[in-house]
């Protein structure tokens, strides 16, 4: 295989593509599908491609016009499978008797009717059916590899029936599958972010294998796989990356200096700052987000939470203003202008030190100038910046700068980070996929 031909669905800012680039895979982008105009601008700027490659809404695109590709990536919309989104998933509601029911891939292709009265049923949330658009394209083009990504809640959505429908659909269109729950915190970013990844390999390229589910595992993923084994899902064993070491803390991805606009005013943070003054942040080993308190903001508890830079970031969301960005307690440094900093004492008329934040002394040819820097037990509370949120998704600073230069606003930059997939997780997946399966096809 000379170049890996890639088709990207629900592309966002192109995390799959960034991962392929970062590990040096020579690939050709056949096309991408994105409907958010700001995400499209960022995607094209980051990956240096024309908007003409965008097929737009995949549910309306003419799939027979899309050329053949080897790899299909699909981070299909997740809100309908999350707890916050209500988990409507693949549910339809009858327009006549109001009966609610899940649908199958065959129902989706033929047109959905109520199983009780046979009237027309409509999706409770159309985003929950977009997996089927991925399946339609995969069934028509028969790529060698399909990679899906979604929230942890997908596993138990509809009491496990949604995962069953997805797995059976992948089997029925010709793919053996494996799936795993991966947390970004184990992939060199300080973000607690669990996502389910499903890999489908065309059944003529891989032998059927019963899943090896560790006896000691009793998490939601292993329970889900055991349920699928009971209905004889066609599967194989992918060598998933290890998840055993948290290597970064939040403080390691923070900018050295951020604009004052990211800091919350003292009225909203006064109580917490006073508490932190008597109980400073600890520097013990932390493998989880470490909440240090709340600030005085209106709204849901989650937007009031403040975290220590010594721990991890909570899972990024689309944020969308209203103080929804993650917040940290930042220890302040005192910076004071000083004359002749190399001397411990100086007899002179006038002041030798300025107060913290005051302008420096006027430069002349006689005195030497410097700054005295010292930490003192005072904290300020601020939001993470858009760049810091992109770093939490393992995008390069250069990627961020390209999106910023394309005129993308801060609110959209936050949203794009929250909607994306952690690039370093995808890098680990691709390294195994390329080494074991793609290169094998080239031989």
From Swiss-Prot:
Query: According to its UniProt record, which reaction does this protein catalyse?
Result: a 2'-deoxycytidine in DNA + S-adenosyl-L-methionine = a 5-methyl-2'-deoxycytidine in DNA + S-adenosyl-L-homocysteine + H(+)
EC identifiers of the protein? 2.1.1.37
Q: Where is the SAM-dependent MTase C5-type domain?
A: 4-440
The organism's superkingdom is given as Viruses
Q: Which GO terms describe its biological process?
A: methylation; symbiont-mediated evasion of host restriction-modification system; symbiont-mediated suppression of host innate immune response
Which residues constitute the catalytic centre? Answer: 78
Q: Name one GO molecular function term.
A: DNA binding
Question: What does the UniProt keyword field contain?
Answer: DNA-binding, Host-virus interaction, Inhibition of host innate immune response by virus, Methyltransferase, Restriction-modification system evasion by virus, S-adenosyl-L-methionine, Transferase, Viral immunoevasion
Q: Does the keyword S-adenosyl-L-methionine apply?
A: yes
Instruction: Write out the function statement from the record.
Output: Modification confers resistance against restriction enzymes that recognize these sequences.
| Family in the record | Belongs to the class I-like SAM-binding methyltransferase superfamily. C5-methyltransferase family.
- Protein name, as recorded: Orphan methyltransferase M.Phi3TI
The organism of origin for this protein: Bacillus phage phi3T (Bacteriophage phi-3T)
């Amino acid at each position: 295989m000379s170049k890996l031909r890639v088709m990207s669905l629900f592309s966002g800012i192109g995390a799959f593509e960034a991962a392929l680039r970062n590990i040096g895979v020579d690939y050709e982008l056949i096309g991408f599908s994105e409907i958010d105009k700001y995400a499209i601008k960022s995607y094209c700027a980051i990956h240096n491609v024309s908007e003409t490659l965008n097929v737009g809404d995949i549910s309306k695109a003419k799939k027979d016009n899309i050329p053949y590709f080897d790899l299909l990536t699909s981070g299909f919309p997740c809100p309908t499978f999350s707890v916050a989104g209500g988990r409507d998933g693949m549910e339809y509601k009858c327009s006549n008797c109001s009966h609610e029911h899940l649908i199958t891939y065959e129902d989706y292709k033929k047109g959905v009717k109520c199983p009780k009265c046979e009237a027309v049923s409509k999706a409770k949330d159309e985003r929950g059916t977009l997996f089927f658009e991925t399946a339609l394209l995969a069934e028509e083009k028969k790529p060698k590899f399909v990679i899906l990504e979604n929230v942890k809640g997908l596993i138990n959505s509809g009491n496990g029936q949604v995962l069953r429908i997805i797995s059976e659909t992948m089997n029925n269109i010709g793919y053996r599958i494996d799936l795993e729950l991966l947390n970004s915190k184990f992939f060199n970013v300080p973000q607690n972010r669990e996502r389910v990844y499903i890999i489908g390999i065309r059944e003529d390229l891989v032998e059927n294998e019963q899943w090896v589910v560790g006896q000691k595992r009793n998490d939601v993923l292993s329970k889900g796989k055991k349920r699928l084994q009971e209905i004889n899902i066609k599967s194989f064993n992918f060598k998933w990356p290890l998840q055993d070491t948290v290597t970064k803390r939040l403080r390691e991805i923070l900018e050295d200096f951020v604009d004052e606009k990211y800091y919350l005013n003292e009225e909203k943070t006064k109580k917490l700052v006073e508490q932190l003054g008597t109980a400073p942040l600890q520097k013990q080993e932390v493998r989880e987000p470490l909440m240090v308190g709340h600030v005085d903001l209106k709204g849901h508890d989650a937007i009031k939470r403040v975290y220590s830079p010594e721990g991890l970031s909570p899972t990024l969301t689309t944020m969308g203003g209203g103080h929804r960005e993650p917040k940290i307690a930042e220890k302040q440094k005192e910076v004071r202008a000083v004359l002749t900093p190399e001397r411990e004492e100086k007899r002179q008329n006038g002041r030798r030190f300025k107060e913290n934040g005051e302008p420096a002394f006027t430069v002349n040819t006689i005195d030497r100038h410097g700054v005295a820097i010292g930490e003192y037990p005072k904290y300020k509370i601020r939001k993470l910046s858009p760049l810091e949120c992109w770093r939490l998704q393992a995008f390069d600073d250069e990627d961020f700068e390209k999106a910023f230069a394309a005129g993308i606003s801060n609110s959209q930059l936050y949203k794009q980070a929250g909607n994306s997939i952690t690039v370093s997780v995808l890098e680990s997946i691709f390294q195994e996929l390329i080494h074991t399966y793609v290169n094998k096809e080239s031989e």
